[in-house]
Amino acid sequence: MSSFYNEAKFLISDGEQMRIDTYAVGRKTMQQSDAFKGTFYENFTLVYALPLSNHDNSSLMLIAGFYALLFMFGTCGNAAILAVVHHVKGQDPRSRHNTTLTYICILSIVDFLSMLPIPMTIIDQILGFWMFDTFACKLFRLLEHIGKIFSTFILVAFSIDRYCAVCHPLQVRVRNQRTVFVFLGIMFFVTCVMLSPILLYAHSKELVMHEKVDLDQEVITRMHLYKCVDDLGRELFVVFTLYSFVLAYLMPLLFMIYFYYEMLIRLFKQANVIKQTLVGRRSGGEEKKLTIPVGHIAIYTLAICSFHFICWTPYWISILYSLYEELYQDTKSTASPPTYAFIYFMYGVHALPYINSASNFILYGLLNRQLHNAPERKYTRNGVGGRQMSHALTTNTRPEYSELIAIPSSSCRPDSRVSAMIHNNNNNTESLPLAQNISNMTNKDSATIVPMPMSANVDGNEIYNWITPDTESVIL
């Protein structure tokens, strides 16, 4: 098949001329096309033309510029979080077993990958057609939907991890690295199964916009373009949309609300118990520093759920609207084309998931106390003048949820609750009744555990070691 590239003019049926320049215009004879063999047009020459680009559309260029800013903001931000996590793990060996940092790291990787399709989206917006092949189309759809599904699954796992850290602090196996990676592997497998129809059917599809036949010159001029489409078919599209809505939006949203709500309820109860325990032992200013910042945690948690809800709800409403049109389009006698305002509005709606992926690193990374305070903890654990500070039983366990046991940093493994209790029994005889009470309670439901009252033999100065400024690190 021979082809050439030149400037051409495309004649619209009403006589209006549309200039086709800077684009390829291919030509081939009908003798080389199986579609017209044995027909009247068998010896006609077929000329292909591409439509004009949208570079002169100022509104669309503004949208493309906004997408470009999202791409730079999201990729740079998530890459910066990955660099910070790598630095923190290098400075503090204990953080290598930190499940919170693991979730933040995986979330940043997924959000970074979900930003990669944005340049292809911008090119498609400006040109008005898909300029890449089918393989690029499949890769584009895969990265786009991974950010929409797998990223949401990670946020749910993150909420479960924080819930377990607060409400079930003694369940160590639930929050170790092996369990986290098994959980992430299962979620990734479920994501791949959900996206299998996209991988099978997504391709670059040719769309013929207009065709004109010149009988005198025996030429057929066809204006066409390519679009990256899922092409699932009506039945499969309905099934795919419904189970994606339920599994990737509705259930994750309900899970996040439930686990964060239960976590806040437990924090309010624990804060009241700790406040009653510390009454009269310290001055008002010092006592305020030792309380749990429940209000700050509640605002932060509400911001997480609200931001996720705001970004994803309009998108899924638009998806359900397209599903409604797919199911009931046969009952419509006439279908008017969408207005420009509606098109621009839909561009904004579909930009919201990208905004969510580009901004997750702020809520889950920059606002996380473990990333903020990790360099400080490295130098403050040794203290001034060689004084060692105590830390919680595990990297992520808040001291007040570890029954207020003070554990020296160099005594035992920081991730071993059993060794911590043994150490307190052997070396701190004054706290023996407290340790025995905790040992007797380990077989009970951790949801019923509350801080035990301090005995009269316990030095009040140790409160600063039991409740440090890092007490909210697992939450924030």
Curated annotation (Swiss-Prot):
Gene3D superfamilies: Rhodopsin 7-helix transmembrane proteins. It is found in: Cell membrane. Expressed in sensory neurons including ASER. Residues 1-61, 124-139, 201-236, 313-334 are extracellular. Keywords: Cell membrane, Disulfide bond, G-protein coupled receptor, Glycoprotein, Membrane, Receptor, Transducer, Transmembrane, Transmembrane helix. Residues 83-102, 161-179, 258-291, 356-476 are cytoplasmic. Disulfide bonds join C137-C228. GO terms for molecular function: G protein-coupled receptor activity. PANTHER family: NEUROPEPTIDE RECEPTOR 18, NEUROPEPTIDES RECEPTOR. Belongs to the G-protein coupled receptor 1 family. This is Neuropeptide receptor 18. It comes from Caenorhabditis elegans.
